[in-house]
């Protein structure tokens, strides 16, 4: 049996909720293309992101534990895949377009620098007088212009709805990207879900990786009421298991708890506000009402857990020292290429006349992996 694009579109209309973004209403692409015979628009977006050079490099970019060696610790790619999985689950449970949520999730970290948030912090400072640097905006730059894989257009030419999902509220974006509608009507519910899935994923895997690496201990974790509540519940249920299995079980339970609360609370709000269309969602956005959120009780617990991790994990002296080293590498590379622009690869150098030297260096350095940046740094004269 063969399902054509039209068959798939018809099947989609039978399963999506009325407030979901359908493939038939994807907003189009900036550069017109012929539709694929058996792939839907958001499927093509997902595949283009997965096959992009920027996505491949995510496996060699770290988030929190810079320069850590170990096969079991997360990197940007494993984090992204976890976010995509959560996004699919939540979107499907709510009758939303899981392909769109997945595509947004897969692209959300493409613009991250090497060396995690330390890299963004130093690059943002270096670029503050030259247009700035912010990883969400950089993700948009990658998929709209920096990636070079197609003969008829720059970037990946993703659907506008996918691009809108990469825009963060309050950020200043270039209007030439033709995405002003996002500022007025807000993100899709699929995009909001990808954002919240990101929060769930990084919080839980930072707990696991921090514990695995010895930066967090059970005694530390039990200081947080939310963790203690989940851990004690698992301990009562699994009395015969050891501490390691119990901690891993608690992390899974915490993830499931947050996902379930989010799904139930969004469903409750959709029903309470009688949401019947994407227009209804846009109206609520203009009224500053966020339909996608945890319940008040869980939201408070989750915020406290994230604050706890900031104090107990992210400010650990070892992590700060590694972050400082990452910043030193990026600052040194930036300064070197400013003084020696001839050393910039030709694929970047040819854009200097169209954009500033600062922007080209920023794009080049931001696209490096951790180990490539360190390798270039160590080879500097």
UniProtKB/Swiss-Prot annotation:
Per the record's keyword annotation, is Hydrolase included, yes or no? yes
Signal peptide (UniProt feature, chain positions): none
- State any GO BP term from the record: dGTP catabolic process
List the Pfam families.
HD (PF01966), HD_assoc (PF13286)
Q: Which GO terms describe its molecular function?
A: dGTPase activity
Question: What SMART domains does this protein map onto?
Answer: HDc
Keyword annotations = Hydrolase
The protein's matches in InterPro entries, at most eight in alphabetical order, are given as:
dGTPase, Diverse_Catalytic_Enzymes, dNTPase_2, HD/PDEase_dom, HD_domain, PHydrolase_assoc_dom
Show where the HD domain sits.
76-203
The family line of this record is:
Belongs to the dGTPase family. Type 2 subfamily.
Task: Tell me what this protein is called.
Answer: Deoxyguanosinetriphosphate triphosphohydrolase-like protein
Q: Which organism does this sequence originate in?
A: Leptospira interrogans serogroup Icterohaemorrhagiae serovar Lai (strain 56601)
